[in-house]
Protein backbone atom coordinates (compact mmCIF):
# COMPACT_ATOMS: atom_id res chain seq x y z
CA UNK A 1 0.00 0.00 0.00
CA UNK A 2 1.42 3.40 -0.92
CA UNK A 3 2.49 5.49 2.08
CA UNK A 4 -0.05 8.20 1.20
CA UNK A 5 -2.88 5.67 1.32
CA UNK A 6 -1.60 4.35 4.65
CA UNK A 7 -2.14 7.82 6.14
CA UNK A 8 -5.78 7.75 5.00
CA UNK A 9 -6.37 4.17 6.17
CA UNK A 10 -4.89 4.93 9.59
CA UNK A 11 -6.95 8.11 9.92
CA UNK A 12 -10.16 6.29 9.04
CA UNK A 13 -9.42 3.46 11.47
CA UNK A 14 -9.01 5.94 14.31
CA UNK A 15 -12.09 8.04 13.41
CA UNK A 16 -14.63 5.63 11.88
CA UNK A 17 -16.47 5.30 15.20
CA UNK A 18 -17.47 8.97 14.85
CA UNK A 19 -19.25 8.17 11.60
CA UNK A 20 -18.54 8.41 7.91
CA UNK A 21 -20.40 9.31 4.76
CA UNK A 22 -20.33 8.27 1.16
CA UNK A 23 -22.08 9.36 -2.00
CA UNK A 24 -22.52 7.77 -5.43
CA UNK A 25 -19.28 9.37 -6.64
CA UNK A 26 -17.14 8.04 -3.78
CA UNK A 27 -18.81 4.63 -3.83
CA UNK A 28 -18.17 4.26 -7.56
CA UNK A 29 -14.59 5.47 -7.12
CA UNK A 30 -13.97 2.95 -4.35
CA UNK A 31 -15.25 0.08 -6.48
CA UNK A 32 -13.24 1.27 -9.49
CA UNK A 33 -9.93 1.71 -7.66
CA UNK A 34 -10.08 -1.44 -5.54
CA UNK A 35 -10.95 -3.59 -8.56
CA UNK A 36 -8.19 -2.23 -10.83
CA UNK A 37 -6.09 -5.06 -12.20
CA UNK A 38 -2.93 -3.21 -11.14
CA UNK A 39 -4.08 -2.74 -7.55
CA UNK A 40 -2.03 -4.82 -5.12
CA UNK A 41 -5.04 -6.61 -3.62
CA UNK A 42 -7.44 -6.20 -6.54
CA UNK A 43 -10.81 -7.86 -6.16
CA UNK A 44 -13.75 -8.15 -8.51
CA UNK A 45 -16.14 -5.19 -8.68
CA UNK A 46 -18.85 -7.47 -7.26
CA UNK A 47 -16.69 -8.36 -4.25
CA UNK A 48 -15.70 -4.74 -3.56
CA UNK A 49 -19.32 -3.64 -3.92
CA UNK A 50 -20.48 -6.30 -1.47
CA UNK A 51 -17.83 -5.37 1.11
CA UNK A 52 -18.57 -1.65 0.78
CA UNK A 53 -22.28 -2.35 1.17
CA UNK A 54 -21.67 -4.41 4.30
CA UNK A 55 -19.59 -1.66 5.87
CA UNK A 56 -22.17 0.98 4.98
CA UNK A 57 -24.92 -1.15 6.53
CA UNK A 58 -22.80 -1.79 9.64
CA UNK A 59 -23.72 1.49 11.29
CA UNK A 60 -22.09 4.90 11.64
CA UNK A 61 -22.58 5.45 7.90
CA UNK A 62 -24.61 8.20 6.27
CA UNK A 63 -25.43 8.18 2.58
CA UNK A 64 -25.31 11.58 0.91
CA UNK A 65 -27.18 11.63 -2.39
CA UNK A 66 -25.84 13.74 -5.22
CA UNK A 67 -27.91 16.70 -4.11
CA UNK A 68 -25.76 19.67 -5.14
CA UNK A 69 -24.59 21.02 -8.43
CA UNK A 70 -21.50 23.08 -9.10
CA UNK A 71 -23.67 24.93 -11.61
CA UNK A 72 -25.81 26.33 -8.79
CA UNK A 73 -25.23 30.07 -8.76
CA UNK A 74 -22.47 31.00 -6.34
CA UNK A 75 -21.78 27.48 -5.03
CA UNK A 76 -18.35 27.01 -6.58
CA UNK A 77 -15.96 29.92 -6.31
CA UNK A 78 -14.38 29.32 -9.69
CA UNK A 79 -11.68 31.95 -9.24
CA UNK A 80 -10.23 29.62 -6.56
CA UNK A 81 -10.39 26.50 -8.74
CA UNK A 82 -7.06 26.54 -10.54
CA UNK A 83 -7.05 23.24 -12.43
CA UNK A 84 -9.47 20.66 -13.81
CA UNK A 85 -8.13 18.04 -11.38
CA UNK A 86 -9.66 20.04 -8.52
CA UNK A 87 -13.25 19.83 -9.78
CA UNK A 88 -14.10 16.50 -8.15
CA UNK A 89 -12.80 17.61 -4.75
CA UNK A 90 -14.61 20.94 -5.09
CA UNK A 91 -17.81 18.97 -5.69
CA UNK A 92 -17.16 16.71 -2.68
CA UNK A 93 -16.41 19.74 -0.50
CA UNK A 94 -19.66 21.38 -1.65
CA UNK A 95 -21.52 18.17 -0.80
CA UNK A 96 -19.89 18.07 2.65
CA UNK A 97 -20.82 21.70 3.29
CA UNK A 98 -24.43 21.06 2.27
CA UNK A 99 -24.65 18.13 4.72
CA UNK A 100 -22.74 19.80 7.56
CA UNK A 101 -19.96 17.24 7.16
CA UNK A 102 -16.28 17.24 6.36
CA UNK A 103 -14.25 16.21 3.34
CA UNK A 104 -11.12 14.31 4.33
CA UNK A 105 -8.61 14.24 1.49
CA UNK A 106 -4.97 13.73 0.65
CA UNK A 107 -5.13 16.46 -1.99
CA UNK A 108 -3.46 19.66 -0.80
CA UNK A 109 -4.61 21.59 -3.87
CA UNK A 110 -8.18 22.03 -2.63
CA UNK A 111 -9.02 24.98 -0.41
CA UNK A 112 -12.07 26.13 1.49
CA UNK A 113 -12.24 29.30 -0.60
CA UNK A 114 -13.30 27.16 -3.58
CA UNK A 115 -16.81 26.56 -2.15
CA UNK A 116 -19.22 29.17 -0.86
CA UNK A 117 -19.88 28.71 2.85
CA UNK A 118 -16.98 26.32 3.40
CA UNK A 119 -15.14 26.70 6.69
CA UNK A 120 -12.09 24.98 8.15
CA UNK A 121 -14.39 22.44 9.86
CA UNK A 122 -15.54 21.22 6.44
CA UNK A 123 -12.10 20.20 5.14
CA UNK A 124 -9.29 18.09 6.55
CA UNK A 125 -6.18 17.51 4.46
CA UNK A 126 -4.12 14.53 5.60
CA UNK A 127 -0.40 14.00 5.23
Residues of each region from the PLM?
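Catalytic-loop motifs flanking and including active-site residues across diverse enzymes
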Residues: 26, 88-89
Amino acid sequence: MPARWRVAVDWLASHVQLGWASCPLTQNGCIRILSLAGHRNAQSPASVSQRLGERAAGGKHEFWPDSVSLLDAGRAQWDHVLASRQVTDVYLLALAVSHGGRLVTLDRAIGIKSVAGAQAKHLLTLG
